[in-house]
UniProtKB/Swiss-Prot annotation:
Gene3D superfamilies: P-loop containing nucleotide triphosphate hydrolases. GTP binds at D62, L63, R64, S65. It comes from the Bacteria. Belongs to the RapZ-like family. PANTHER family: RNASE ADAPTER PROTEIN RAPZ. This is Nucleotide-binding protein LSEI_0959. Displays ATPase and GTPase activities. Keywords: ATP-binding, GTP-binding, Nucleotide-binding. ATP binds at G12, M13, S14, G15, A16, G17, K18, T19. SUPFAM superfamilies: P-loop containing nucleoside triphosphate hydrolases. InterPro entries: P-loop_NTPase, RapZ-like, RapZ-like_N, RapZ_C. It comes from Lacticaseibacillus paracasei (strain ATCC 334 / BCRC 17002 / CCUG 31169 / CIP 107868 / KCTC 3260 / NRRL B-441). It holds the Pfam family RapZ-like_N. GO terms for molecular function: ATP binding; GTP binding.
Amino acid sequence: MTESLDLVIITGMSGAGKTVAMQAFEDLGYFCVDNMPPALLPKFWELVKESGKITKVALVVDLRSRAFYDQIIDMLANLDNNAYVHSRILFLDATDEELVSRYKETRRSHPLAMEGRLMDGIKKERALLTELRNRAQVVIDTTTLSPRQLREKIFLNFKESGSQPAFHIEVMSFGFKYGLPIDADIVMDVRFLPNPFYIKDYRPKTGLDPEVYNYVMDNEDAESFYNKFYDLLSEIMPKYKAEGKTSVTIAIGCTGGQHRSVAFAERIGKAFSDAYAVDITHRDIKKHKETVNRS
């Protein structure tokens, strides 16, 4: 007897976090496909069924046009009558204001506002997606969620009973002058390292620039501290995992979050990326850089 296919359709507002969601499903062992045209799905099901090896699929479905939307609705109707496929819909949402903010930050164009106002495109998309949202088994509002928090919500809703998703580490740089990260599990202060801020050529740059990174890391104090911190994390990460945590946030801070913490976070994050799923984020890098450039 052919094993049924567990299908999750990831959809929702553009900019609400579908890319992060797809990565989370990959960590849960799903075969993920981004933006496959609905017209190709029957052939895709046929190939999956014939392979006999794929039992969990997550499809990211974006709204490109009214015609595309009609194809999606037809696809869902066909799935309702398909005994082989057990489907669920995950709808990701966020407030209009938050979506505008995210689009302005990334400078990308909204798919339904290529030649018009961003807000008009958002409102048009929201109206078109009303039926899909109403049909969704899971709706997640990502307005106030970090990528880590969204991942955890997906793990909570979609991991199989008794299964454990891949352990996830978020390494975050930050500036103490902008406050401690409230969701950090581990906070480390690297303000004792040499500060590139006082070197004129390095001041407008960041710890992502090779010359600044090397300035911060290429000294005995930095190397010694890195080795000890790495050893500590190597010892405690398996213990966090054994306790059932799905993720740990390591926050590394310097004064402004532009130079030292960025360089150190990059090195720590990359060091653990072979053993764990790792995200490296720099909370205050743009904020402090703008302040420096104005001074």
